[in-house]
Amino acid sequence: MLQPPYGDNLPQNGFIPGNLSYTPPDISHPNPAIQINVDPKSTRLQVLEPFGPGPVGEFTDLQVMLKVKGKCTTDHISAAGPWLKYKGHLENIAHNTLNGALNADNDKVNVVKNVFSGKEGAIHEVGREYQALGKPWIVVTDHNYGEGSAREHAALQMRYLGCPLILARSFARIHQTNLKKQGVLPLTFADPADWEKMHGGDVIESTEGVADLVAGRPGKNDTPEGGEILLHVRRPDGEKYVIKALHTMSKDQVEWFRKGSALNAARG
């Protein structure tokens, strides 16, 4: 009869008990009553206020503030280097928003026109001006928008400055998800050639499909990977046209969008 194999692989007398005095760390119990004090004069730290909820219906009157041409990495969107000291202060680091982006309409870097004042300014400046006027704005971008390091601020800053939607020829996957986490709707052109049609100064008068998306209703031409959103656009000269765009929002991501951010959704 065969005998089971034997080997002296384990100590015959067992293991040494070890340090019996070890005490595991306490499990933390968050206390919302505790106040975290941040100096309001600090340039490095700022208490982050939750973003507001997403739309309950269609978007209307979205200003196309910028059409980006060519490569636009997360470093173009939110530069590192000396800006890193402001990572804890969203208002301050937002001054670098898209400061490396090339404007397809004027071939200038970080220069856009405020259609309400007629003056040119840095992208973050005009974004704040639009926000002060209650005018949501969007960016039209080229291929592989947001490639590079997975920089959360590249999405945070866009949302903070009042950009609820970005329309791209294509997105870098991680940045696309980061935008969704911050309540920004990333759309791609159904036909990438339609990028040529749009310009800064155009206005998306209304969307068609966002209301169904946030309500959880089946949309036009939905697929397991997403669905279709139509953009009804008006040029400055009054000419109108329609852009067919696509989204890739999952059920969970729609909830982030509806609540205003993934953090809002997690908080309930």
Where on the chain are the PLM-derived regions?
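Fe-S-dependent hydro-lyases/dehydratases of central metabolism
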Residues: 1-268
